[in-house]
Amino acid sequence: GLYFSNFYAQVGVGTSSDTEFTYSTSLMPSLNGTVFVNYYNNKYETIQKLLKEKDYYVFSMHGNEGNFWNRDVMHKNLGYDKFYSKSSFIIDEEYGLGLSDGSFFKQAVPMIKEINDNHELFYGTLITLTNHTPWAKVNEYSEYKVSKSITVGGQYITRPYLEDTTIGKYIKSVNYMDKCIGTFIEELDKEGILDNTIIVIYGDHDARLSKKDYEYMYNYDPYTDKVLNSDDENYHEVTNYEYELNRKVPFIIWSKDIKNKEINTPMGMIDVLPTLGNMLGISSKYALGNDIMNIKDGDNTIVFNNGSYLTSKIYYNSRNGDIYPIANEVINNEYITKRVVYTGCLFFCKKY
């Protein structure tokens, strides 16, 4: 499959709902409130509606209440034929915010099989729950170890390292979800559903880990069981630049006939519809994003909801006007100004 290693969600206060909107429409989320709550009555051209024009049956599934983020209303507006929310599932195992991902996927397989049996073409969105903060009881469902073992004085000892830390809980939760997705794909394959199917996996927003979480992870010394002091020569300072850019989320496009390839071109959520659209034979005239497979020179511009932007060459911080170099080359003012204008146009103008 295709792994996009430089992918960012472009969310505002609507977090998950912003991603569902941006993914579906290739439009930026609202700067005032959230689209799902404040602008749910507007008409949007979406990937769901475009596929329905090609006779796809379109559905969504989520183990949470249907009214959360106004999904029961907005999913219909996006073009879904049916939204299977909490009431469609047996809540037999709860972790974190609700129905566990393991149970969710297990129950989803026969539902998808029935859809596959009744519809020649289908498109489905499955929204998970477990891998979401605060991961309070992660040890109940994940046995993944985030401790660190070392040899001291000829003795093999284990230090706690990330155990019982926020970032450690997150890593354990990710491992659980990874296993759940793997089992889900295996079960779909057993039902013969994967032979002509594309699976898209994305993270709807970053984990919202703090800078202190990263500093602890990078600077923990297992030999002393302490964190390095900032004046230690081995201390890794997490700069504001590093912290702001360490918010990538996964994006994977997989099918049995797609060869494995990593794509590191900067990509945002608004680029999904044009990219998938090129593969599926659909396009939206309102899309603000780009087909990432056909970006000139691989220099895409990722615009964030606060006005900052990222390219393959620089990161521009809108709050203070700072520019952080990414590529080892001289960048002229024209390059910067052009992208500042482009950033404004994404929010306030039509695509040019």
Model regions: which residues?
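Solvent-exposed soluble domains appended to multi-pass membrane proteins
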Residues: G1-Y352
